[in-house]
Amino acid sequence: MQSNLLQFSNLRTGNLRLASTNRGSANGGGSSTMESGTSGAGSSSNKQVNMVIENNTLTIGGTEGKRAFGRRLQMDTSGLKVKSKVDQEELESAMKTPISGIPFFNQSSRRSYQFELSFHNTPVSDDCHVLIDVSQLPGAREGDLAELRTYHRSPGTRDKKVYFKIKSLDVEARRRSATTGLSILTGQLRYLLDLPSRSPVWVKLKSKNEHQADLVELHVKDCHVNRGDMWCISSTLLDTCVFTGQRVTYINALRLIVKAIYRNGKKVISGYVGNNTKVIFASESARIIFLIQITEEMWHFEQNGEKTFHKVVNSLFPRILKRWKDIGTYHTITIVFCASVDESGQSFRNIPPGVRLKNTKDYFRIVVDRVNILYWDEIMKTLRKEFMQIIGDLRNTQTDDGGGPIRWSFTPVIKSNILETINFATTLLADQFRVPDLKHTVTHVIIISPGTGLYDVNYDLLKVTCRKLLSLEIAVDLICLSRAPLHIVPLFRYIDYQGELCHSAPTWLSISFWDDNKKSQEWHPRCKIYDVQMMGVTERRDSEEVTLNYMNSALHTTSVTDFMDQYDKEVFDADKCYPLSNENRESTPLEDTSNIESTVLPKSGHEVQSIVWKPPRSSKPLVEPTTVQSVIVSLHQPGTINNSSEDDLTDTSSSNSSPEANESLALASLKNMTQISRGLTKRIVSKLIPDIKSKRSRHSIMATGNEHPRNDTYEDIEDIRKVDCHSTGTNITFLKPTFRSMDAEHYNPPDTVSSHGSAGTDSRRESLMFEKKSVLLDDFAKKKSNVNKYIKEKSLVDSLIHLDNPSVCFSGEVATMLIPDRWKDVYPKYVAKKYTKWRSFTTPAELPITTVHFPSLSDFESNFIFRNHSVSLNIDREVYGQTTFDLLRDMIYIRLLAGFQICTSELLKKVEATGSNEIHEQEIAKVLSKDNYMVAIYYMIIDNEVHRIKCGYNGTIDVQRFLRKNENKMMDTIAKYTPLVRTRYEHSYRPCKMDPLRISRTSLRWNQVDQILAGYYDSMMDSSKIGFRSKFVILPADIPPNTFSSTVNGRKETLSAEEIRLEGLRKLISSISKSRLRTNPEKATKASRKEEILPEVHFYTGSLFEYLADHHDNLEHVDSPAKDAQSADLSKFNRDAELSRLAYELQHGEKPIKLTNRKWHFKNHSSCFVGLEMVNWLIENFSDIDTRDEAVIYGQQLLTDGLFHHVDRRHGFLDGHYFYRISDPFVDIKIEKGSAESPLNSDPITINRRVSASTIISSKQNSSGMIQSKNGDSELLDRQSVNDEGKTIVISTAIDIDLDPAGNSHKLETCTVHYDQVHNPDHCFHIRIEWLTATPKLLDDLVTNWGRLCERYGLRLVEIPWHELCTIPSFDPTHSFIEATLAINPWTDPEFMDAEIFASQKYFYHVHLLESFGFLLDNRASRILQNERVSFNVVYSWGKPSFKYAQFIHNTGAYMAEIRENGDLFLAPNNLYLSRNGIGNSSGSLHLGPKSAIYSEKVMLDFKHVCEDYKKLRSVFWEARDKWQQTRNTLEEY
């Protein structure tokens, strides 16, 4: 009935209206008609009368127009007892009067009105693309939802519908569009409609609740969008309309594209985003990790003679890479070979099902690591090369005589290390605050397997893996290279604690089958008999033909009619149902063909016209009655990935319950058998040819008689039962699937019974077996309510579907459970998964923000413990405009970053009802707004943790945390796992430096996190604080030609390369300083002159310790202001001041300028100051100088007047690191000889003040406990105890900067920047960034601007890992590196061993080797900073350094190096920089070229070759020795 009503929408109650009665019409007098309001605008002559009330008779389906349901319905009411005859006018009045409590329907609200189309160029707002004259649309108000529809009369075009919200034209627009009344913004929407101006369109008002989209898919490209920003973007899209191709802009920084909109199972071009709309984010710049299983099946041959692995390199990868190229993605890929070698020498066929091989070793070979797909040719070349080598690397054993006999063997795929492989990949996401880079979103894992999706696994490891994946925002796809099997896949077999064989289907593993055969209609055998194939039995030869004997049929029949009668009797006779004992549960693979019939179906010859997939009849539920179409997961029809079209890439689980194809499945089995085993059927039919005509007629009758579904239970069973045509009648059983939760063992849900016929002989088979249990025929009458009940009680930890018999077809309700609950929002309603499978590989989606997944009430009450804490906003945060609303948003934001999802389950209302004392019902919200944040409750859920967040009216936010019990005991059952790993540049396998099975994401200390968000944190130097971190270094690069000379104050200045780079650093620091975070009062007032006073970076050359010893009094603490704020207001002078007075103030005033002896490149400059300090001093002390430019002009005037001059008299007065000296006529105090630094101001008060400040700094930091040793070295601790008695010098500066000065964001966008306060131009300049809730795109824009600024001054900004290089393999096993041992040990070689050199610098030769190849120092070893020659502690603003080795960066930024204690070198590529700049639009034109990654690899390999080449290395060491003989200066220790 419902489907017919859809065809006659004008008969709905809301569309019926009372028509005016024409007394002279053919209807007769006293008649009234009800007619549709959906006719054309203003057209009354063609109205169709579908309902007539005449002479007390109601007639539906009049003589005009199309009759509803093809018939006329009448109801005679003349027999009703009424007081008087119903008057027609009274009837009309009564029908027009609204019923109490029901609003009267406005007849114009569903009427279409015609408008003429016009266009405008200036956008009114970001979400408004259509403007309309509201006065021309009756009943419309601003904010209502409307539909714009186009009608195309040409045969090649289709009608288009665009939804928009009513936005009125302004006065000027109405004047210009007086005749049109509707205007569309020029751009994508105009292109989408493809209509010229003044085209007619029709507009109709629509209901928001009835017309909201089901799913909107947004695509992200070339930027990192975290899940917190995804939530914010989803919130901004609420109550808006979107269309395909629309560019969505967030905070004027993030730009996303609407790629797909789904509604009611169809892909539409426009939709309304309502409360129930799911917004999904997919990435076009993701990190893809390919894990290729290397098993013995990789060397098997296919039917066409192709090796299995050749399918990977010749069809699968080229197809995927081509698809990426066509879409324009910027993925970076990592390819890993995963192999398990069996050293037992026994056949796996002797191992029982579900049991793993014991004597095995796992190997992981990193083929490529984070390489951009732009280098696809090099990727494929490396892939082919590595595959040819891996068999020799793993199976050849080295003997003493140098031989390499072949031993061992690869494990078969069924016994492979599938769970260990998945755990190996999850190590990359163990830390939720370790961002790979700022250019990529989403990490996706794709496993390529030569098998069929069946694996034997360890039970304990399976539980640990399921638990781990529930806490990570990662999706895993499995691509199988074999043909789809006849059982449920993916399928895990294991032995449980009772010693029984169990089968489980994981919900977190999505499987597909790759088929590169374009002839999809071609038949192929479904059973794999590899040994027979290799003997050539299955090959067709011209010279000879192998004949197989006919199969003996147990049915002794002489005609097709008797054959079918006997078949039906065996299937439908209840007396033939025999129980099957446990001993007789096996059958021969060749004879057990029922699964073949139920799985393999011929592909439909016609194209599917709608996006709703119509499945084959064998994918229907076997028990449940036919229902409305719904997308389920088919468990017995594995999909194939075909290289011909996107629709051919299917999932094992893609089917619908369709009202079509309801004929008997027993008959369908005969049809399928005819098409699958065509040869065998012909032989059977040839014997029974006399009765062929009766067979055809019987076939036609049966097919015709099953068009309509039947309600009788036994008839339903008769329709859906199917048995092999070769059944003997003695082994007919009914299989019973059982579903239960793995971790909720106390819960036993009722069995769900489905029918499935199986047949076979008493023969046994030694391969895969599935338990079969017999049930009575009456069990088939069970309803699907049991299944629904189980689904409702599905627990939080249920990520496996347990199966007693995986060969049985599932019902639709149970099949949907194979879609993981956390990822269900990714799939549109009523759309088969096969239509989204290619997008999973090309543009993977991020974990959805919301979920309906929640533990059952019984599970929640009994298995969770309760914790709570409260947090309120620090009053100090109010000066930045922060409120409780902002704190609540940040708390939800940070939890989304940690992998939580916002829960919207209906069970939450019951949870609230049982545990709340509130009188009014609380709102369970998913969107935060200022209207509801005081009354809404937010439930956030992750694997084993549930958070309930509620804001009270007093401003206190209460957090209730529910933690699952006994979560830490699962890991105790897992043995230590140490696989062998070989990275890209290594020559041999080595033990992995981490245990992939035990690396998991730990829960955060949420009380501490919330307190930090509220503004309660003690020190920026707390090393235990959480947050995101990025580290950058600035390296020298080529200087643009037009930068060497410039004009300052009318004077042409020519700068050296070093001076230009120092000027670039000063400009960068100036940019950072001016971006500092300001309070609201500071923003409201005019910028003071102290904003022009820039912090000083102390540049030096030579030894760091000598400089610190000489200038430690001039180093200011990181938290101190650049200058005293009050001094800027105590201006004493103006530009008319006398030079003599200025000279005195410069040397003897209250705040004199620092005049010191400075050493620069072995040249001493006595009694000088820096130009930057002079500019700061002028701004502080002159009332009529407000900017740095004015100070430079006045300083040039003082230099011209002779007050001071440049030390080399090469420059005029410049703002920067330029040395100047007061002219001799104005100097009256000489510097004391022999002192490294003698302040010209001998004021004891000033000196005491500086010393006192340093002492206070030391006491503060030592008392805070933040500066602690981590490595436990006793010598280091002793050195620290000595240094603690002295002062602490902080050699970097921290500043909080504002990432959003324009105020586009809805939240406070801030981060902390740490930069070096002491810098040697020969080394790297460091910038570190720390943030927590800032938008990554704003940070990326900030870094990009810094890179462009550096580029103009001959500098290169390079991102490097935050952690020390040697520690990276401990948390990222895929990161490649090289260990190089020098061919000459300079410490023992008599030719280079020199005690004098090693006394100054132990690693003199090593450092010279690195510097000669373009390396610059990045970090010193921490032990060097605890030098006995200095009596103070050296720390950074971000914490105390803990580097074990000295680290160097190559001047290209492409790779790094470390010097080990034994003199070996540790090299590794800088993947962060290579992947970031491979995109091609990062730091201006400094991005790497097309072959830069390959070039950097060549440079690194060449450097390693030099290290291992005796002659070349000896030449380099001789250069180092000559350099020492020439200088003989004290060397800086690294």
Curated annotation (Swiss-Prot):
Question: Residue ranges of region Disordered?
Answer: 19-48, 580-601, 637-662
Q: Name one Pfam family in it.
A: DEP
Residue span(s) of domain DEP:
1149-1224
User: What protein name applies here?
Assistant: Vacuolar membrane-associated protein IML1
- Highest taxon above the source species: Eukaryota
Q: Does the keyword Membrane apply?
A: yes
- UniProt organism field: Eremothecium gossypii (strain ATCC 10895 / CBS 109.51 / FGSC 9923 / NRRL Y-1056)
Q: Which CDD domains match?
A: DEP_DEPDC5-like
